Amino acid sequence: APAPAPAPAPAPAPAPAPAPAPSPATGNNGTSGIDTTATFARTTAEIPNPDRGFYGWAGSDFVNAYDAASVQGAYNTGYRLVFAKVQLDAYRTSDLPSSFLTALNARFAQVRSAGMKTTLLFNYDFSGGGNDATAAQIKRHLEQLRPVLAANADVIPYMRAGFIGAWGEWHSSKSGNSCGYNSGTTTCATADANRAIVRDALIANVPATTQIGFRIPADLIKWYPSPTQQTRVGMHNDCFQSGPTDSGTYSSTAQRSYIQALSLNTAFGGENCADAEKPLRNSCADILSEGPAYHLAWFNSSDWAGFISSWRNGGCLSQVAGSMGYRLQLDGIAHHTAVAAGGSILVNVDLRNVGWARFFTQRALVVTLRHRSTGATISATAAGDLRTLAPQATSSTRISVPIAIPAGADKGDYDVLLSVPDIFVATAGNPRYAVRFANADNTSLGQVWDGTGARFKAGTTLRVN
């Protein structure tokens, strides 16, 4: 196959070990020199959070049969992702009309207004037939889709590679995009060349903030021999845990090892097969071993083969739901007790990602000081990126946030609040798209989650003199 398009930048370095407490002078100017500290209790409760977890459905066809009630029902259930399946059957040999692109844009707006995001799939044949389009036509469609996808990147954290073959799963193509199983006389050389065209078109036209999930491990290994060489192309496994080979997904232990390494830095999600090979690996022991091993980030809530029922009956469903993707836990906070107006103060926050997977979209910690009487606020955003936090962490990482206090700031006591808003303009101010920490309220210590502002009140006080 032709060489892949240049890989995105390498993954952020794993989070460092907790830093030693800074000296009082570091980042502080005009402060009391006296520290106040607090620790936080974790919670094991399921926490609905964007870009992760079980996903619902947005209807049988995202453009032509959008199901607003289903999307709202998924939100009410605690899901924050919906499967957006876009049917392109009518356009196998033609351009996408402007009316279609306008309608697609409107559907994303509906998802946004519902507080949801999507896992997106474009396909020409959502059946075993594989009646797809040529690689050239797929490339053309992706070029047409580019502006709509870019305008709605905030609600497209994940996109399956799609387009090719049966169900958009990159096998059984009737247009020369696969070889072997159910692919006619197409040679593998021809199929590889066509698949590379589609791969490059996906990378070129899908927003850089969107993770792209390919179906076939062998393709990924061929394109990216090292599983750590890029951070954008991951895997969608339509037959996760569905028999010894995941119903033909893997042909060797080496392929499994590669995907486990790949998914440390790129998104891995999927579903179970309705017609899975046997025996299934659907026990709690199975998912609690393989979920973290593959860094499972998101998963179909439909119980195709009794997997979810098995997890529920085994008593682990809540743990699975709470562990998929990231799970951001606050451990502690420290800062000086007072600062002069016009001075600066350093707030040190200890936290960790105890979820099965990384953050895949850029996020940053925000510290807000809120005056107890006037409500005036002073905010600062931490440098860096929460994607650097390694998943399944067993120790804290310290994030130090310097805050400049305006000379004209209101004097008096301020509460300290912590938040992680979305980075996109369209959703940054919407509390439904902010990350909720995996911490329990403790009203006696003044530690409370504020759902309206999507901020955690740390229970500490800072006086501005």
Spans of model-derived segments:
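Boundary/entry segment of secreted carbohydrate-active catalytic domains
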Residues: 24-80, 85
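Aromatic-lined substrate-binding rim segments of carbohydrate-active enzymes
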Residues: 67-125, 135-138, 210
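Active-site groove signature of glycoside hydrolases
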Residues: 119-128, 145-189
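Aromatic-lined carbohydrate-recognition surfaces of secreted/lumenal glycan-active proteins
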Residues: 156-167, 199, 203-223
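Extracellular/luminal regions of secreted and cell-surface proteins that mediate adhesion/ECM remodeling
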Residues: 5, 322-465
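An active-site-proximal structural segment forming one wall of the substrate-binding cleft
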Residues: 100-113, 133-160, 191-205
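Ser/Thr/Gly/Pro-rich low-complexity, disordered linker/stalk segments of secreted
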Residues: 1-32
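Substrate-binding cleft of secreted/luminal carbohydrate-active enzymes
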Residues: 216-334
